[in-house]
C-alpha cells in the first residue's frame, strides 16, 4: 500500500551500553523539527560511530553503534551557555572564528575521533535514550570509521 492508514509499529532499537566508548564523528547535518508548542527549530546533529558492537541482526551482521547528538543551533557559537558551545569546547574544537557554512563546520568535525561517555536517560513516555555526557579529544589517530554509515546528505539525495 502506498499510504497506509494503519499505525506504524515502533521500531525496536538497541541502546548503546553506558560508559566510555571510542568514537569518530561520521556525519553533521541540520534538521527542522516542530516542538510540542508548534514552534519550528533548526537542530544541528552530530553522528558518532563508536567502537561498541550491536547485537547481530537476522542476517548475522554485527554493526557498530551510532549515536546522534542533537543540538540547538545557537545565534552565536560563542554563547557559553549553549550546549553546542560546551560540546565543541570539551572536544577541543577551535570555533573562535565561527563557521561561515555547514561545510566549514563539517571540515572541523568529520572523521575527528573522540572519547565519549554514554549515559541513559528516560523520556516522558518511558523510552530509554542514549545521551552523550562527555566528548573528549583523542591524542593520535583514534577510532576510525568502518564505512558502514551512510551520510544523511547521501540518503536525502536519493531517498527512495
Where are the language model's segments positioned?
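Short beta-rich binding modules
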Residues: 1-160
Amino acid at each position: 500500500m502506498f499510504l497506509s492508514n494503519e499505525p506504524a509499529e515502533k521500531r525496536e532499537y538497541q541502546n548503546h551500553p553506558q560508559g566510555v566508548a571510542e568514537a569518530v564523528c561520521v556525519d553533521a547535518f541540520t534538521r527542522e523539527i516542530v516542538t510540542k508548542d508548534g514552534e519550528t527549530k533548526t537542530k544541528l546533529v552530530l553522528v558518532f560511530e563508536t567502537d561498541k558492537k550491536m547485537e547481530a541482526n537476522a542476517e548475522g551482521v554485527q554493526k557498530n553503534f551510532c549515536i546522534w547528538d542533537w543540538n540547538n543551533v545557537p545565534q552565536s557559537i560563542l554563547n557559553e551557555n549553549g550546549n553546542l558551545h560546551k560540546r565543541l569546547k570539551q572536544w577541543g574544537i577551535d570555533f573562535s572564528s565561527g563557521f561561515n557554512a555547514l561545510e566549514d563546520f563539517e571540515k572541523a568535525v568529520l572523521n575527528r575521533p573522540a572519547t565519549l561517555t554514554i549515559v541513559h536517560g528516560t523520556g516522558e513516555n518511558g523510552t530509554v535514550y542514549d545521551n552523550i555526557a562527555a566528548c573528549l579529544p583523542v591524542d593520535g589517530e583514534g577510532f576510525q570509521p568502518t564505512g558502514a554509515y551512510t551520510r544523511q546528505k547521501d540518503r536525502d539525495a536519493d531517498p527512495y
